Amino acid sequence: MEVEMHGDVSKWEGYADWRNKAALRGRHGGMLAASFVLAVEILENLAFLANASNLVLYLKNFMHMSLARSSSEVTTFMATAFLLALLGGFLADAFFSTFVIFLISASIEFLGLILLTIQARRPSLMPPPCKSSAALRCEVVGGSKAAFLFVGLYLVSLGIGGIKGSLPSHGAEQFDEGTPKGRKQRSTFFNYYVFCLSCGALVAVTFVVWIEDNKGWEWGFGVSTISIFLSILVFLLGSRFYKNKIPRGSPLTTIFKVLLAASIVSCSSKTSSNHFTSREVQSEHEEKTPSQSLTNSLTCLNKAIEGKTHHIWLECTVQQVEDVKIVLKMLPIFGCTIMLNCCLAQLSTYSVHQAATMNRKIVNFNVPSASLPVFPVVFMLILAPTYDHLIIPFARKVTKSEIGITHLQRIGVGLVLSIVAMAVAALVELKRKQVAREAGLLDSEETLPITFLWIALQYLFLGSADLFTLAGLLEFFFTEAPSSMRSLATSLSWASLALGYYLSSVMVPIVNRVTKSAGQSPWLGEKLNRNRLDLFYWLMCVLSVVNFLHYLFWAKRYKYISTGSIS
């Protein structure tokens, strides 16, 4: 990291403090500044997951949506929230800073949660209670009540997206990437970011879910509202310690300009004079920037340099071309993680319904089915510090490298664990249906004589997969991306989650349509005990294996850009 002298104190080049003055080394940044970000993540994720983990039951039992629609609405809500992280990352890189984007986004989420709290508290804004257990006698939410619901939900979604697109990058920017110590601290930050994310999730799926089930949803939404408000206060308390990256303009403009310039030059007819001029311009450019040279990868983009001869707006520097190459080479890795997140989406919805049919008592306490994620969360809380303080130091000694385990190796482990998770889920569903059949309860709503702890097995594997993949992706995109595109690139981690949820919502109707057209009953109908959820899980397992082989193809060919990423 280059520094400039500011009096007797060196300043961070390209960074400012919260007053828009020069950020100074020793006063701004470091682990203290990042600690505020970690505390904020606990509160922010608590507010988010407190509702998301139980939302499918809220829509089904209080808004009277069908099982299929409530599941679809939840996956769409989650997907939209994560996809909007791209917008937050783009705005942070292009026009604002991660500091400003977080404050705006958290305020938007706060407003959305207030609306949801008001609706849950006022019966006039809710559909009337069902007159009987028959679904036909239940009035599904509609009209202005539905509008109130979805405005609140998608304000929350917009706020979550902005937070996810800015907060991880804001924390990672606090470290000096020019030193081994700074890079190691940044790696530790990403591990503990996932740890703190899990801390918030633990409170959400235990304490807040219990409140929602026993005290009412107005209390659940109220806790989330207070939590996001506290996150804003904690974030502001750290303002004097942060160093905020100064935006350098739209990264999308750079990408579009390079791609367009390369396309125009490639498609235009080349005369001998054009070739001469191009070589002349390129030689002149190389004289100005002797330390930079075009690489041999994605050579089709090298033609963007020639675009300077005819189009002033399309003039590209070597650095811009190389930056776009880096982004394009990361996209296949991004694409290979979508399937894992599709598996995560399926288990986060159907596993809740499975657990609702099983015996959820531990001693004399009846565990809410929405609290099932407590199992992977607890495991992630144990695994994250173990990974950072035991596994990584050991790996550094063995590999003699700064990073120990590469980002791509870490992501690969996560993909393998997701395959195991889906196989376990299929076997557990077979066991659950066998118990239902033997007890004569296939068509009954009575609790099955089988403990819900069986469901915990698939959650443990998927939670481990999520830990390895999410932390690996966040650090991979941040360290490999050009500095002007880091927030946007880091947002790809959340965009992968979004596309996984969208793929999940698309797969269910497709599978039902295909199985129905084959003369069978739809695999995923309304009656869970008559479904073929086990076959659906096996299908997901097979697709995950194919996806992993696809990942290996790209991971083996990827060449790291950043210092400290190579093992």
From Swiss-Prot:
Chief location of this protein within or outside the cell: membrane
Coiled coil segments of this chain: none
Single GO term (MF): transmembrane transporter activity
SUPFAM superfamilies: MFS general substrate transporter
Keywords attached to this entry: Membrane, Transmembrane, Transmembrane helix, Transport
Membrane topology, from the record: Multi-pass membrane protein
Pfam families on file: PTR2 (PF00854)
TM stretches of this protein: 30-50, 70-92, 99-118, 147-167, 189-209, 219-239, 326-346, 374-394, 411-431, 448-468, 491-511, 535-555
Compartments reported by the entry: Membrane
Superkingdom assignment: Eukaryota
Physiological role: Involved in abscisic acid transport.
Family membership noted in the UniProt record: Belongs to the major facilitator superfamily. Proton-dependent oligopeptide transporter (POT/PTR) (TC 2.A.17) family.
Protein name per its UniProtKB record: Protein NRT1/ PTR FAMILY 4.5
Organism from which the protein derives: Arabidopsis thaliana
Gene from which the chain derives: NPF4.5
